[in-house]
């Protein structure tokens, strides 16, 4: 079939297999061209491995450090008449490249929040790796089913204390308007913590520890976005921010639980990037479009793969990591520089519908959004007839 993007609201409902492969190969080429840290991981578990920062972590581990990887994800396979999800095609492309390089890459498709998938992962680690020395936790989900009680928790993107009305870039209509978001109630705050907080990261690390599959000196990271004043009302100081604070609690608990292994758990603060998750958050399309304008002009912008390649080199495997006052790895320091934030704020305050293209780099934002789904990639023939049916090797 000929596959063109089908965009509904802030999501694209299909994906292009050839485009996704080209996008993954771009990231692999970037990592191969970099100078990696002298030390690095050998056996890596990536929980949330198919898109964004999780995929970038898997690529960096394999093609920067020749590490074996086990990837956990929950993706929709293709059929004869419907495309699979972007994450499905991304993983198929990654595994194909790893196979060609002769580097182990195994995959589990299922609900990472469940006991069943944790048990499957442990079984695979015992059989093929023995132990893992790096665990990357990079899940984004609107819901989580409690594996013990069966209760379904839901996350919300709401402010705390009082409702917020703020400027917004409506990507469907391509206009600057306002968005109003009601304040969360206590149940919504707790639900967001239960989904996006550190509980499942902790469950994973406890299960791995009890099974004896964590290596001496094991490292684990969970990814977060902190942001600054512009994004705090609906992000950093809102329900999702409370959930991210719970990651700090979990990091402390995991450090205590892995002390006998000299383990290290750190939350990692990363840049705002265009992902399937961030595109759903009010204010983020406008913020990121303005940030693109500033940081690309400065030559300092880093996407997922640049951020993660540098995270491994500058922080996870560095003797002098850059930490914030909470002990998190700070990989977002360029974005949060005062001079950058001031110029982004100036754009934010000035932009209207007529000046979107002049003042922001919404064009780049939209291009990045399409690339998530394999569209708009140089060298890909989007008029060609392609089969949507692509298999993932080494999938259980």
Swiss-Prot record:
It is an enzyme of class 1 (oxidoreductase). Its EC number is 1.3.1.9. Substrate binds at residue 225. Keywords: Fatty acid biosynthesis, Fatty acid metabolism, Lipid biosynthesis, Lipid metabolism, NAD, Oxidoreductase. The record marks 75 as: Plays an important role in discriminating NADH against NADPH. It catalyses: a 2,3-saturated acyl-[ACP] + NAD(+) = a (2E)-enoyl-[ACP] + NADH + H(+). NAD(+) binds at residues 48-53, 74-75, 111-112, 139-140, 244, 273-275. Belongs to the TER reductase family. This is Enoyl-[acyl-carrier-protein] reductase [NADH].
């Amino acid at each position: 079939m000929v596959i063109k993007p089908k965009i509904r609201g802030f999501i694209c409902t299909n994906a292009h297999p050839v485009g996704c492969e080209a996008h993954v190969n771009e990231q692999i080429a970037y990592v191969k061209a970099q100078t990696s840290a002298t030390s690095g991981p050998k056996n890596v578990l990536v929980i949330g491995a198919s898109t964004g920062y999780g995929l970038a972590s898997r690529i960096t581990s394999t093609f920067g450090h020749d590490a074996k990887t086990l990837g956990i994800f929950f993706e929709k396979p293709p059929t004869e008449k419907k495309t699979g999800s972007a994450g499905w095609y991304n993983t198929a492309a990654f595994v194909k490249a790893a196979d060609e390089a002769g580097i182990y890459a195994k995959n589990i498709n299922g609900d990472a929040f469940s006991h069943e998938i944790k048990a499957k992962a442990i079984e695979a680690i015992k059989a093929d790796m023995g132990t893992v020395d790096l665990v990357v936790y990079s899940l984004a989900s609107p819901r989580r089913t409690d594996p013990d009680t069966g209760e379904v928790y839901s996350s919300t993107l709401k402010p705390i204390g009082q409702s917020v009305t703020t400027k917004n870039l409506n990507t469907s209509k391509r206009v600057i308007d306002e968005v109003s978001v009601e304040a969360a109630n206590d149940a919504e705050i707790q639900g967001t913590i239960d989904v996006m907080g550190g509980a499942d990261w902790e469950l994973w690390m406890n299960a791995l520890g009890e099974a004896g599959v964590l290596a001496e000196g094991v490292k684990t990271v969970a990814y977060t976005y902190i942001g600054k004043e512009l994004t705090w009302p609906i992000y950093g100081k809102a329900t999702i921010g409370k959930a991210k604070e719970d990651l700090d609690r979990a990091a402390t608990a995991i450090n205590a639980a892995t002390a006998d292994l000299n383990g290290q758990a750190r939350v990692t603060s990363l840049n705002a990037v265009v992902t399937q998750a961030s595109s759903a958050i009010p204010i983020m399309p406008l913020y990121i479009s303005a940030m693109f304008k500033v940081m690309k002009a400065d030559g300092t912008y880093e996407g997922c793969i640049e951020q993660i390649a540098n995270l491994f080199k500058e922080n996870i495997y560095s003797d002098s990591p850059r930490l914030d006052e909470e002990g998190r790895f700070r990989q977002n320091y360029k974005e949060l520089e005062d001079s950058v934030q001031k110029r982004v704020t100036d754009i934010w305050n000035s932009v209207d519908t007529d000046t979107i293209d002049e003042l922001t780099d919404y064009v780049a934002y939209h291009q990045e959004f399409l690339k998530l789904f394999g569209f708009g990639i140089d060298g890909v023939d989007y008029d060609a007839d392609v089969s949507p049916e692509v298999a993932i090797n080494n999938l259980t």
